[in-house]
């Protein structure tokens, strides 16, 4: 399988395993009437979503828009789509022909695509408060990374599984909704919504005013984290807060990026991701001088 095919049809085994584990071990699901359960507090009908064609940066894409009508802040939303049962052989052949003409895929790999059921997905890790909306979320072929641009291809699929992550009492819960069985299942494990370092380094950088912080490397040399739910304006305000702490030595910057040292040699690195409304950040200690 060549690299193009891998990017095109990569399947998410982790998601499949998570659905299996949560559905089998938790034993907490709803019936088709939507009866409430202990851990599932999300009703999929409260997330109003739509997929259609749209123009993004001058190009036509198939995109997902949705509104959070739940009572909770959402941190992740993903929908996978599966091939409709009534797709004809002619429609499947036309789909494969379109793919073959659009991408550099060998005949051997095309045979593998022809043998697969059509699937697609759309996902975003935007942090969305109740009543807020998200637009222009790209849809992708299969579980890969190639953008979906033909609405006729989307018309060959139907919703399969929705994955929703939401905040409740400073924890992030994960819920799955199966459109086929009309049942919910919940992950037994939760995540801390705001993960902040307890090392001395954490006192050398402002705590972002957001609801979700995901920590990465965290030791005496460096503290790395991602903060979610920031606008570019909020990111620029955060830069100014870092400057007020003295991070103005040998600065490097452009829109969406800032890095500088303070007088003691500590460094901050800040990068803004406009697509996910998030900030990649780190604060690092001075490098030890070699003897």
Model-inferred region functions:
Residues 19-23:
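C-terminal motif of bacterial Sec signal peptides marking the signal peptidase cleavage site
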Residues 25-28:
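Bacterial signal peptide processing site
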Residues 34-49, 184-223, 284-291:
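Compositionally biased P/S/T/G-rich terminal and signal peptide-adjacent segments
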Residues 55-57, 83-106:
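Short aromatic-acidic-glycine turn motif
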Residues 65-73, 86-87:
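Asparagine-centered strand-capping/turn motif at beta-strand->loop junctions
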Residues 72-80, 90-97, 236-239:
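Short, hydrophobic/aromatic beta-strand segments
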Residues 102-171:
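Short, solvent-exposed, Trp/other aromatic-anchored flexible loops in extracytoplasmic proteins
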Residues 211-273:
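A cross-family detector of function-defining hotspots
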């Amino acid at each position: 399988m060549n690299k193009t095919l891998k990017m095109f049809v990569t399947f998410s085994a982790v998601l499949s395993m998570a659905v299996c584990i949560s559905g089998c071990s938790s034993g907490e699901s709803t019936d088709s009437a939507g009866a409430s359960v202990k851990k599932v507090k999300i009703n999929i009908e409260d997330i109003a979503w739509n997929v259609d064609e749209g123009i993004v940066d001058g190009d036509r894409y198939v995109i997902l828009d949705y509104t959070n009508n739940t009572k909770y802040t959402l941190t992740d939303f993903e929908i996978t789509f599966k091939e409709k049962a009534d797709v004809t052989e002619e429609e499947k052949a036309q789909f494969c022909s379109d793919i073959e003409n659009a991408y550099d895929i060998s005949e051997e790999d095309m045979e593998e695509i022809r043998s697969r059921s059509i699937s697609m997905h759309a996902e975003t890790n935007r942090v969305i408060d109740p009543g807020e909306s998200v637009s222009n979320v790209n849809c992708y072929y299969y579980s890969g990374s190639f953008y979906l641009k033909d609405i006729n291809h989307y018309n060959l699929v139907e919703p399969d599984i929705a994955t929703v992550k939401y905040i409740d009492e400073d924890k992030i819960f994960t819920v799955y909704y199966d459109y086929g069985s009309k049942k919910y299942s919940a992950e037994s494990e939760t995540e801390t919504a705001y993960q902040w370092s307890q090392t001395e380094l954490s006192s050398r950088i402002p705590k972002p005013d957001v609801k979700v912080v995901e920590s990465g490397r965290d030791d005496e040399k460096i503290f790395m984290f991602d903060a979610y739910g920031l606008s570019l304006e909020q990111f620029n305000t955060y830069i100014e807060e870092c400057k007020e702490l003295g991070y103005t030595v040998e600065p490097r910057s452009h829109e969406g990026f800032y890095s500088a040292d303070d007088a003691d040699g500590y460094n901050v690195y800040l990068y803004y991701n406009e697509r996910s409304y998030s900030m990649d950040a780190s604060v690092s200690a001075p490098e030890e001088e070699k003897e």
